[in-house]
Amino acid sequence: MTVEQKFGLFSAEIKEADPLAASEASQPKPCPPEVTPHYIWIDFLVQRFEIAKYCSSDQVEIFSSLLQRSMSLNIGRAKGSMNRHVAAIGPRFKLLTLGLSLLHADVVPNATIRNVLREKIYSTAFDYFSCPPKFPTQGEKRLREDISIMIKFWTAMFSDKKYLTASQLVPPADIGDLLEQLVEENTGSLSGPAKDFYQRGFDFFNKITNVSAVIKPYPKGDERKKACLSALSEVTVQPGCSLPSNPEAIVLDVDYKSGTPMQSAAKAPYLAKFKVKRCGVSELEKEGLRCRSDSEDECSTQEADGQKISWQAAIFKLGDDCRQKSYWGARMPTDRILRLPASQDMLALQIIDLFKNIFQLVGLDLFVFPYRVVATAPGCGVIECIPDCTSRDQLGRQTDFGMYDYFTRQYGDESTLAFQQARYNFIRSMAAYSLLLFLLQIKDRHNGNIMLDKKGHIIHIDFGFMFESSPGGNLGWEPDIKLTDEMVMIMGGKMEATPFKWFMEMCVQATWLCGEPGPYMDVVVSLVTIMLDTGLPCFRGQTIKLLKHRFSPNMTEREAANFIMKVIQSCFLSNRSRTYNMIQYYQNDIPY
């Protein structure tokens, strides 16, 4: 019945979102079938067969018929006889092992039935490997059981004197550079409301960005601040428009008092806040097409749903090369100011966003925040500000205590539920960013580039040094992972503490996920390879070779775990992290 009704093991596969193509309507998350009933049922069948093969030929015939109906000779078709999700691997191969046991017991007299059943068993086994590999979503106990089942199937298959090999070929992504041509073709084909929507959006954004050019001639200080507020007050909100850094929300209003010039005298970036209504890309397009540039009344952007309305901060900049310097502005109480956009930052954030989608897809409870950086033209761009965040640098300027003291004052002592939840958030974000710091070799990790949000997550920003570049003339002084004493204190104070063991366990899980046994290493390597010809300073000839080595390819699970554990141990309370913080304090007045 479960075969005909497509339940459990025989259910149709739910297509999971590709981490490389995640969208509002297609969020990456695991979609395993419910196979627990089949686990129980097949266990019963295995136990029953051990009795039936000695005493009941009728029951053996029923078993043979059941197996024949449950399996198929088809391999790799769009609709397989069984679900190919990794969560269904246990019951699938347990059923196949039962089939081999029936053949080996020599209780099926008909040779034709035996041969067909044997072929169906092998075809069903091959069929599982006809789809791209996936990372396990099962719990630890169930995963161990599934691995044990696979070993038993291999043993049974080996005794059957049949050898199966499978070649899994993942074709490279077909990536071309036809973007400019596509943009010209698309914009040239616009007319009517669509063209008005396009022109209205770019006109609004150009006016917002041009404030940077207006304030550039003014000296830093009160004069530039006044010029910024004056220029911002002349910007009128266009109906149905969005920010490039936040295309899922309609801009309702501008906080004309929020204009804040950054510290850079030459580039003149500034921060502004906008009231936005989050509605999704599809709804925004509908709203934009309903609006007319000469009539805001026709645009249905009523502020009916208060939960969808919020204030969003962003940084705008109009100037020349935006790659050479970092910009830090007046320290905001709720939103943090990030460095200006660059191709290198965008590459790092693309990879971080990819890992975020991968973590969601495989059900790994890790946290990263890939804030958006959009380069709109050479030297021009907009950056999404991280809400409800404070930098470790800002924390040091406002108070005289470290991160651990901040946690105890903010969330209570270690026995409180609030502290434990914040610590858990800290650990799962530390594990994710530690893996990324190691894989991408992200450097310049001073306290100005480390953030804490109100939930306890740690967030890294500013990726000006990565791969084969590092501060101080590429000295490579900093360790692979930043694990300072205050970070360790939050995670228990020592490596033997339970919270720190959680951290190491999460790092090991994430490392094994990203290594060669999973399908994701090639995706990251390909993404970096595409950028090699850009001339970014982080590429010095050995980037891909060293990146592949850090992924610990060709290692067993145990070897990969030992590999990342040694990295963590070598970075634990490293003096190089502390001395780098001291250097930043004396050179750039960044507290530590």
Swiss-Prot record:
A Pfam short name: PI4K_N
Residue segments, region Catalytic loop: 441-449
Signal peptide (from-to): none
Entry keyword annotation includes Transferase: yes
Example GO biological process: phosphatidylinositol phosphate biosynthetic process
Residue ranges of the region described as G-loop: 281-287
CDD domains (alphabetical): PI4Kc_III_alpha
Span list, region Pleckstrin homology (PH) domain conferring phosphoinositide binding specificity: 180-318
UniProt keywords, alphabetically: Kinase, Transferase
SMART domains per the UniProt record, alphabetical: PI3Kc
All residue ranges annotated as the PI3K/PI4K catalytic domain in the record: 275-576
Family of this protein: Belongs to the PI3/PI4-kinase family. Type III PI4K subfamily.
Protein name: Putative phosphatidylinositol 4-kinase alpha-like protein P2
Species of provenance: Homo sapiens (Human)
